[in-house]
Curated annotation (Swiss-Prot):
Identification of the protein by name: Protein PsbN
Transmembrane segments: 7-27
Coiled coil: none
Signal peptide region: none
Organism per entry: Dioscorea elephantipes (Elephant's foot yam)
Function: May play a role in photosystem I and II biogenesis.
Length: 43
């Protein structure tokens, strides 16, 4: 394989991994610990 192909696959893998991790933090088990500023602000 060419170097450019390997670099493209590596960067794409990093992007997919980061996106998956961000979705896990936002909607997965750790999201229960996040605070919701809209819930804290009562009108």
């Amino acid at each position: 394989m060419e170097t450019a192909t390997l670099v493209t696959i590596f960067i794409s893998g990093l992007l997919v991994s980061f996106t998956g991790y961000a979705l896990y933090i936002a909607f997965g088990q750790p999201s229960q610990q996040l605070r919701d500023p809209f819930e804290e602000h009562g009108d």
